[in-house]
């Protein structure tokens, strides 16, 4: 029996036929290089790039938070035990009373006052007792009282106090100022109290990164002759110079 085999004829490519695309070359490691713009972040190189971008964003965010805390309203309020050898007694007014509204703010000013109370015994401790009673029902408060030997701290520096008489005016004494009362009691040493107030002012300016141009008088915010003795004597510029001298020591 004879079996016949018919061989298939070879296929001829048409002269107009397009060549079949070749597969993409593989790298030495046997992997094809990633296609640009497609699933790039799914590749090792893409993941490294993404990680680098995330790190850059995190570093920038941390730097921004640090700047805000350093320069903004979130800076922790100071609570010194002493300032250049002058003892500081912290005795905050209770939260929720009329004289402590609890409004947090950015510190922009240190506002200088005098108590206006020349009576014997009207020192810093006496004014601390007074403000703890008065602030229960009245919108009256300040941050520090200073006499010739000590300082009382009545409110956190980052909270509003009612001392400047300008309500909550933007960039005002109440909203953005730390109120310091200087005692003028006749049985005290006024000049030494002023010197201690200069030390405290220098400390606060240094802590909050402010210059002496941020020292204000009560009378800068409303029409009131305060600090009266200092203003009447034309001694405020000398007070600012004294503050600068203490700042230079810090």
Annotate the PLM regions:
Residues 1-39:
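N-terminal targeting leaders characterized by basic, low-complexity, disordered sequences
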Residues 2-3, 40-43, 48-52, 63-87, ...:
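Basic/polar, cationic surfaces and motifs that engage anionic cell-wall
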Residues 8, 17, 37-38, 72-74, ...:
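Generic cytosolic/nucleocytoplasmic N-terminal low-complexity/intrinsically disordered segments
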Residues 11-13, 22-24, 90, 97, ...:
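A generic alpha-helix propensity feature with a strong bias for hydrophobic helices
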Residues 16-18, 22, 30-33, 74-77, ...:
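Compositionally biased, intrinsically disordered/low-complexity regions enriched for serine, proline
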Residues 28, 35, 44, 70, ...:
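Intrinsically disordered, low-complexity segments enriched in small/polar residues
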């Amino acid at each position: 029996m004879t079996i016949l085999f018919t061989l298939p004829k070879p296929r001829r490519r048409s002269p107009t036929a397009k060549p079949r695309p070749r597969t993409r070359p593989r790298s030495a490691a046997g992997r094809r290089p990633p296609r640009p713009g497609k699933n790039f972040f799914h590749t090792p190189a893409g993941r490294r790039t993404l990680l680098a971008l995330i790190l850059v964003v995190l570093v920038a965010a941390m730097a921004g938070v640090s700047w805000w805390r350093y320069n903004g309203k979130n800076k922790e309020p100071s609570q010194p035990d002493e300032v250049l050898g002058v003892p500081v007694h912290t005795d905050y007014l209770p939260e929720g009373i009329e004289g402590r509204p609890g409004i947090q703010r950015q510190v922009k000013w240190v506002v200088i006052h005098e108590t206006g109370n020349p009576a014997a015994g009207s020192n810093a401790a006496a004014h601390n007792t007074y403000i703890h009673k008065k602030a229960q029902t009245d919108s009256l408060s300040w941050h520090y009282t200073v006499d010739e030997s000590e300082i009382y701290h009545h409110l956190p520096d980052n909270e509003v106090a009612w001392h400047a008489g300008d309500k909550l005016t933007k960039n005002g004494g109440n909203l953005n100022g730390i109120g310091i009362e200087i005692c003028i009691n006749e049985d005290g040493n006024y000049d030494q109290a002023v010197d201690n107030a200069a030390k405290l002012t220098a400390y606060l300016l240094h802590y909050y990164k402010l210059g002496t141009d941020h020292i204000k008088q009560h009378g800068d915010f409303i029409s009131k002759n305060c600090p009266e003795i200092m203003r009447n004597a034309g001694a405020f510029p000398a007070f600012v110079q004294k503050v600068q001298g203490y700042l230079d020591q810090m």
